[in-house]
Swiss-Prot record:
Its main location: cytoplasm. SUPFAM superfamilies: Class II aaRS and biotin synthetases (SSF55681), GAD domain-like (SSF55261), Nucleic acid-binding proteins (SSF50249). Catalyzes the attachment of L-aspartate to tRNA(Asp) in a two-step reaction: L-aspartate is first activated by ATP to form Asp-AMP and then transferred to the acceptor end of tRNA(Asp). GO terms for cellular component: cytoplasm. It comes from Phocaeicola vulgatus (strain ATCC 8482 / DSM 1447 / JCM 5826 / CCUG 4940 / NBRC 14291 / NCTC 11154) (Bacteroides vulgatus). GO terms for biological process: aspartyl-tRNA aminoacylation. This is Aspartate--tRNA ligase.
Length: 587
């Protein structure tokens, strides 16, 4: 037996017991004739004491222990004279009588502490060391608890967990696939699934009316803080349901997770907002509702007064930051530079302060009378001490997106984006299609299997761009944590959808014939939803990136710097797969 207890287990009630512990040396320090060692394992830290007066040889051996040595000790639990109430074991220490060094260690390249001195790159290269840090371990423990609660909740609702294949056919619609060459079928390739979408629909055709799976998915796309090339979905599908049934079931699951994992009771129904309203008032289909600053459109008030920036604009809109009139000129200039950054793209920003006497002082006073500025103030319901920030531009959608970024930045600066406050809502009634400038055609906003709203089906023939989808996203604190839709279960409607998306009948049959054929054998009405497990965990843990809740993540270039992957294959492997590498140089 290597240990009788863990390093986070012993308490004052255990005083006098002989115990054996094993773990890693967090730190060792010599003070006079005593040596103190903090021993760490997954469960906590326990202080060890070596007394030179009692056993000089043992104490000398302890003096040679380095950081991250793996040791086993036996000793007696003793009450500490200088208690550390910041840790659960802080009232006791172990007077060591036996020390075994199980493994020595070279000095790690960064400190194994919550506030480590290691940067992102070095910690990812030595991820196995980074995982020893308490804060990282807690994220993975939270992830484990979440998957347990997900399974418990869905099992209680009659869902079956069914695994679907990892090697599937490629469907180029949407994000890029990761492809896998087949040795046994030269010149042919599998793809890693972007989601189990069509497979779970086939399970509905098969009669498995409530399916779920906690599943790895893969997308070869550009990365950012909330994306990884491989990620985990809580994937679910239900038969004989309408949108309201699905929303009710998975809102219930969200409330269950909040209660069990965060101790937060969400008794009220989640807010609902149409996609059109989300864009109109927040410039985003995933609005952060922890704070206000709803957009106000100012076209009728601000156009036609000789200020060409506004007079030539297709959209003028603003936000009102309560109590922020004290912003200095320097702060306002910094906000202007913020919105002018290339990734945001605004040309500038107009601001106006509401003074103590109710008058409005703006950066464009010479173009506007106080009467017009008062109309603007009333449009915002602004009060003395408030700050109004305005953007304009030739493209309404782009300008709203810029205003969204400004709103989020001001909310951050004012401390309104509290990570311990949760604002949940459903965004519904998405457009069925969106226009792709790159492709020169309509694309499915979600995927080709989304059912249009019944009342909009006639528009498929006359005005497909106006069709709304039976689709819904759950948004928490400005993060899309999940989304889904009612699916098409009629092969004729599915064929119509492929036609609008530019598929020839031959291409539709080649890529999705298996699904179209299945529908001919009696497909039930069905729909579903997929939650992003990584996003849920990072939200509950208060993280800025999903990378911190994944055991072995990729960096922003999609590389695993620890495994040095991806990497070139040996020529023998390429020959076996009948592959030739021909890298085209960028022109």
């Amino acid at each position: 037996m290597f240990r009788s207890h863990t390093c986070g287990e012993l308490r004052l009630s255990d005083a006098g017991k002989s115990v054996t512990l094993a773990g890693w040396v967090q730190r060792a320090r010599k003070m006079g004739g005593m040596t103190f060692v903090d021993l760490r394992d997954r469960y906590g830290i326990t202080q060890l004491v070596f007394n030179e007066a009692v056993n000089a040889e043992l104490c000398e051996r302890a003096n040679h222990l380095g950081r991250e040595f793996v040791i086993q000790i036996t000793g007696e639990v003793n009450e500490r004279s200088n208690k550390n109430m910041n840790i659960p074991t802080g009232e006791i220490e172990i007077i060591v009588s036996v020390l075994n060094v199980l493994n020595s260690a070279v000095t790690p390249p960064f400190t194994i502490e919550d506030n480590s001195d290691g940067g992102d790159d070095i910690r990812m290269k030595f991820r196995y060391l980074d995982l020893r840090r308490n804060c990282v371990r807690k994220n993975l423990e939270l992830r484990h608890k979440m998957t347990m609660e997900v399974r418990r909740y869905l099992d209680s609702k009659g869902f079956l967990e069914v695994e679907t294949p990892m090697l599937v056919g490629s469907t180029p619609e949407g994000a890029r696939d990761f492809v896998v060459p087949s040795r046994m079928n030269p010149g042919q390739f599998y793809a890693l699934p972007q989601s189990p979408q069509t497979l779970k629909q086939l399970l509905m055709v098969s009669g498995f009316d409530r399916y779920f799976q906690i599943v790895k998915c893969f997308r070869d796309e550009d990365l950012r803080a909330d994306r990884q090339p491989e990620f985990t979905q809580i994937d679910c599908e239900m038969s004989f349901v309408e949108q309201e049934d699905i929303i009710s079931t998975f809102e219930g699951m969200a409330k269950h997770l909040f209660k069990e994992l965060r101790g937060v009771e969400l008794s009220e129904p989640f807010l609902r907002m149409t996609w059109a309203d989300a864009i109109k008032y927040y410039g985003s289909d995933k609005p952060d509702l922890r704070f206000g600053m709803k957009f106000v459109e100012l076209m009728d008030i601000m156009k036609g007064h000789g200020f060409s920036v506004f007079d030539d604009a297709a959209y003028i809109g603003g936000i009102c930051a309560e109590g922020a009139a004290s912003y200095t000129r320097k702060q306002l200039d910094q906000l202007t530079e913020f919105v002018k950054k290339p990734q945001i793209g605004a040309k500038g920003m107009v601001y106006a302060r509401v003074e103590a006497d109710g008058n409005v002082k703006s950066s464009v006073d010479k173009f506007y009378s106080q009467e017009v500025l008062q109309q603007m103030k009333e449009a915002f319901s602004a009060k003395p001490g408030d700050l109004i920030l305005i953007l304009s531009g030739p493209d309404a959608m782009k300008t709203r997106k810029q205003l969204c970024e400004l709103r989020l930045e001001v909310g951050r600066q004012l401390g309104l984006r509290d990570k311990n406050k949760f604002a949940c809502l459903w965004v519904v009634d998405f457009p069925m299609f969106e226009w792709s400038e790159e492709e020169g055609r309509l694309m499915a906003m979600h995927h080709p299997f989304t059912h249009p709203k019944e009342e909009d089906i006639p528009l498929l023939d006359t005005d497909p761009a106006a069709v709304r989808a039976d689709a819904y996203d759950m948004v928490v604190n400005g993060v899309e944590v999940g989304g889904g839709s009612i699916r098409i279960h009629d092969s004729q409607l599915q064929a119509k959808m492929f036609e609008i998306l530019g598929f020839t009948p031959e291409r539709a049959q080649e890529q999705f014939g298996f699904l179209m054929n299945a529908f001919k054998y009696g497909a039930p009405p069905h729909g579903g939803l997929a939650y992003g497990l990584d996003r849920w965990v990072s939200l509950f843990a208060g993280l800025d990136s999903i990378r911190d809740c994944i055991a072995f993540p990729k960096n922003n270039s999609g590389r695993d710097v620890m495994l040095d992957a991806p990497a070139a294959l040996d020529q023998s492997q390429l020959d076996e797969l009948n592959l030739v590498v021909d890298i085209k140089e960028d022109k």
